Amino acid sequence: MRLKNSLLCVILAISTAAHALESGPPPVLSPMQQQAQAAHLSAQFLTRFHYKPVPLDDTLSAKVINRYIKSLDPEKFFFVQADIDQFTAENTKLDDAIYHEDLRIPFSIFNLYQQRIVERLTYARELLKQGFDFSQKEDYSFVRDKEPWPKSEAESRDLWRKRVKNDWLRLKLAGKKDQAIRDTLGKRYENSLARAYKYKSDDVFQIFMNAYATSIEPHTDYLGTSAAADFDISMKLSLVGIGAVLQERDDYTTIRELVAGGPAQLSGKLAVGDRIVGVAQGDKGAMTDVVGTRIDDVVKQIRGAKDTVVRLDILPADAGPDGKHKLISLVRNKISLEQQAAKKTILTIKNGDATRKVGVITLPAFYEDFDGRRKGDKNFRSASRDVAALLAELKKEKVDSVLMDLRNNGGGSLTEAVDLTGLFVGKGPIVQQRNARGDVNVEGDDIPAPAWTGPLAVLINRGSASASEIFAAAIQDYGRGVIIGEGSFGKGTVQTMVNLDELSHNDKPKFGELKMTIAQFFRINGGTTQLRGVTPDISLPGFSDPESFGESSYDNALPWSQVKAADYTPVGDVKGLLPQIQSRHDTRVEKDKDFQRFQEDVAELNALRKKRVISLNETDRRNEMNQQEARLKARGKAGAGDSDSKDKDAADAADLNRQDDGLQANERSLSAELAAEKAQKSAKDVLLNEAAKILGDTSDLLKANPKFAMQPASGKDK
């Protein structure tokens, strides 16, 4: 798992904050004894109990080292060929080293990686002191994953010269002046350089162990103590904190969003853009300065026990660096991560003179409060319980049909996938599992009657994986609803969490956890969702790249296979209506300007993906930019007569968002970044609207052909 700047939904962002550069070489990191013990224990488990047991030998050692190097330097910007030769000389030693609890090999690789970061970025900053000649005809290979490693330091420096030149040209084309470009890039490289001084031993171990785990199979992972805690939080949808999305921006931990109903929002004392410069515990605890501190460390200080006090030293959003601070006290409380929970909306779809109400339920994850369920908490949170409540509300609002939006739902609890399917098909088998011994077990739901028997559709994309695929596949096999969108991810494997500390009887978290593949999913029709995923009944275009995203993009994915079909009876026959549904969809989108724009965007993106080299000549790049602007202007004129202004505004916003400003996310203003995200969401709505129209067609056809609808044998609506 590579360390990246990324948001952890609703409460924190785990990214690396930049600060004023430290002098001297980066710290030399060394493994701790407990890490070596955890690696040894993990190896024992993975070789004995994994669904695909792979011995830790010389062959696997070579794969692990290669994957580890790739995770550190995927685009080959930092190491040179001599470094790689040095690393691969250790290929046959890693397995023995792990069993002897010796992690010097991965740590020595990482320490050289830190050294190379400092060398390359120091050189990049030096290049900013000079200008560049953009009249020259030269190209830059900006996608380098398949390129050879630089053969020498001179070749590496020339690569970085082109990289900096391209960064400069992008800002220049966006209208930035030379000094502003120097300032922006100087800060960018300084921030990147500062990260080399902030890595910890735990970071190195996490990256290495993930390289080891994923070398066996793509969905096997190692989670250190911090990562394991975050995984537990994401599944429970709750934690104790202040209720704020935090993000690193220009050395500060910045409030990006306030969670409705959380302590931060209810206090009325915090606003989006406020910067946290200090954290103190309790009413009298000493204030700790957190400027320049890694954001995950800041989050650890803000989290705490329920009903305890945390004090924050705040630099207001509208204050300058020397502005007046304010000190606020907040009482920590249990925060529900509502933005990951199921939500409903109602879309009104017109079809000729008829108007239909489509209830849309968006489910980002199959979450479940495992502890709450085990303890018998009557109000524990889970995806199926929340969706059941939303279905009851939609029925009261008299919707004609229900659309389950599972786009980018990466899965979660298997139990929840089964229970959620039961809400729509009633009692019966949902999914089959085969373990490492070859035993096949059928998982089903015993709900006496479905919660919704009306028209149903499921919207999926390439990001719909695991539990999402179980649900979509079962709905498809039962003939219960129409599956719409892109082909799904193709993750048909079952993982379990192995707590290494519990196995070792440790009193405190020390060794972390393994997420280990132990079984494989199969549809009730006998085929697996592994590798091939779920093929939609009605396909919609999407931005995903199957060559780089999805199960088929992994070089060591488990193959597709098949078992005997389960004993089940379809409850409907939506397939019988698919030709008519497809025909209506095709006719409609031919006249839908917004949908046509979306298809053009997808085609353009696919063409750009094939482009791995870009010109560093200013005239050539301006010509490309002018062609793009001309295309967008022509599109705007063509759509000027559209009656649906809302959809047109969404498309225009998406177009605007694609204009290259040469900036990285944390270099834009917070308001600009949030506006860009809103525009991206608007682009997604084009597909959602069409999916709702497809479901509207389905409703009409089911009403005219009731024999294809869900039969009452499964019970009446609850």
Question: Where in this protein do the model-derived segments appear?
Answer:
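Extracytoplasmic/secreted envelope proteins and their assembly/folding machinery
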Residues: 35-43, 57-69, 84, 91, ...
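Bacterial N-terminal signal peptides that target proteins for export
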Residues: 1-7
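Conserved functional hotspot residues or short segments at active or partner-binding sites
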Residues: 176-187, 523-524, 528-707, 711, ...
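PDZ/PDZ-like domain segments forming the peptide/carboxylate-binding groove
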Residues: 70-71, 92, 111-122, 132-166, ...
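Cleft-lining beta-strand/loop regions that shape enzyme active-site pockets
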Residues: 20-31, 44-57, 61, 194-201, ...
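Bacterial N-terminal signal peptides
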Residues: 8-16
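Extended, small/polar residue-biased N-terminal targeting/export presequences
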Residues: 56-142, 186, 193-248, 309-311, ...
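Polar, glycine-rich mid-to-C-terminal structural blocks
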Residues: 467, 479, 484-549
